[in-house]
């Protein structure tokens, strides 16, 4: 049984990670029940649906961030975990915590994923820089993690973060993985961009993704007249980002790119910028790297993605548009270095982040935790 406090459209990292795991386990012949608050899944075979919380005047804000908050229902939870060999909790929120409690009471092994930092939650209440609130949030998370039999950490960064606060765990560091279609392939740059440098950033238009720093940096670049910034995504900060983009000589492009178009974009782009101020894993960054696109990554202490940089020229001072502009200019001024490092990035990613291999590791973790070693 997979427990998802957040599940809906595949437009956020947690939902994507959950659905990739669910599909992979199903393809391997396992029977998977999904416990979630997604009303659209009501009556769909394999799904057990709990209600969502009514937050009154905050409902609109929560919806604009692309999530729903689950309200535990013990009867639905018991039905979902009945006969399960293992329960895997995606997030340590109220539904996941209650499912873990009921599963443990029935002697069912439980594992849990560490997919969210405290700041991913506290940023929505504008308190991501308040250390006591972040510590309290981790304390709440720990109530779930302390009762489970194994913890899945998508990055070593997250394992070090949690174990630094609460001590050693039975942890497994396994990437959520990159789909095999994200790889270098010959793609012609569209005619409209032939005389432009295309810079891509992928992710929800949200405070923590910090795309504003890229738009500000583009305006400071020596190549500003030729920079075509493409912000692939959607989200609540779109209006503000569009306003910032009006300062640029070349209007930035906004919008969601279907899978195949995203692969093409990452193969004809010139640079990828990962500007997030906080990031648990950053699959979008790994997708770009896997296509052989040189990244410039925020060095924020709250970002796991900085570990993907193979050279200091792929890191920028996370709060400095000027520093980012300098890094952009260097890479654009050195196309041979860009091509050489792009190949190195693609080769490095192919060995570590293949989704099929990562899902095999996830299956092994679940079987080991369930007491059924592969």
Task: Report residues per predicted region.
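Conserved acidic donor-binding segment of nucleotide-sugar-dependent glycosyltransferases
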Residues: 310-321, 330-335
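Carbohydrate-associated surface elements
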Residues: 38, 157, 177
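Nucleotide-activated donor-binding/catalytic signature segment of Leloir-type glycosyltransferases, i.e.
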Residues: 239-260
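Short hydrophobic beta-strand element within catalytic cores of glycosyltransferases
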Residues: 294-298
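Short alpha-helical donor nucleotide-sugar binding micro-motif in glycosyltransferases
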Residues: 81, 256-257, 264-269
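Membrane-proximal helix-turn-helix segments that form the acceptor-binding/catalytic region
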Residues: 118, 132-150, 165
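Aromatic "clamp/platform" in nucleotide-sugar-dependent glycosyltransferases that forms part
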Residues: 277
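Conserved donor-binding/catalytic core segment of Leloir-type glycosyltransferases
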Residues: 1, 190-219
């Amino acid at each position: 049984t997979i427990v998802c406090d957040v599940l809906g459209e595949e437009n956020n990292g947690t939902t994507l990670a959950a659905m990739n795991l669910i599909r992979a386990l199903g393809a391997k012949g396992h029977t998977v029940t999904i416990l979630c608050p997604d009303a659209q899944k009501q009556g769909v075979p394999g799904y057990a649906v709990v209600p969502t919380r009514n937050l009154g005047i905050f409902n609109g804000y929560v919806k604009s961030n692309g999530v729903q908050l689950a309200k535990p229902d013990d009867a639905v939870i018991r039905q979902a975990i009945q006969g399960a060999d293992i329960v895997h909790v995606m997030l340590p929120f109220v539904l996941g915590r209650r499912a873990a409690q009921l599963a443990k009471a029935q002697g069912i092994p439980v594992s849990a994923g560490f997919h969210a930092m405290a700041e991913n939650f506290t940023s929505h209440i504008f308190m991501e820089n308040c250390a006591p609130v972040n510590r309290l949030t981790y304390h709440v998370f720990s109530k779930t993690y302390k009762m489970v039999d194994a913890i899945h950490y998508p990055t070593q960064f997250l394992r070090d973060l949690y174990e630094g606060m609460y001590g050693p765990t039975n942890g497994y560091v396994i990437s959520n993985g990159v789909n095999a279609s994200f790889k270098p392939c010959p793609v012609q740059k569209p005619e409209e961009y032939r005389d432009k440098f295309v810079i891509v950033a992928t992710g929800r238009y949200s405070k923590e993704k910090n795309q504003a720093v890229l738009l500000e940096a583009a305006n400071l670049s020596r190549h500003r007249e030729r920079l075509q910034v493409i912000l692939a995504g959607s989200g609540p900060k779109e209006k503000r980002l569009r306003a910032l983009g009006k300062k640029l000589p070349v209007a930035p492009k906004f919008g969601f790119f279907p899978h195949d178009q995203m692969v093409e974009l990452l193969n004809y782009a010139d640079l990828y910028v990962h500007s997030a101020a906080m990031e648990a894993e950053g699959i979008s960054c790994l997708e770009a790297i896997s296509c052989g696109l040189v990244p410039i990554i925020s060095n924020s202490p709250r970002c796991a993605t900085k570990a993907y940089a193979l050279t200091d020229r792929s890191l920028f001072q996370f709060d400095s548009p000027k520093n980012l502009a300098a890094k952009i200019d260097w890479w654009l001024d050195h196309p041979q270095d860009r091509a050489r490092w792009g190949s190195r990035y693609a080769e490095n990613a192919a060995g570590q982040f293949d989704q099929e291999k990562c899902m095999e590791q996830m299956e092994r973790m679940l079987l080991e935790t369930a007491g059924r070693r592969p």
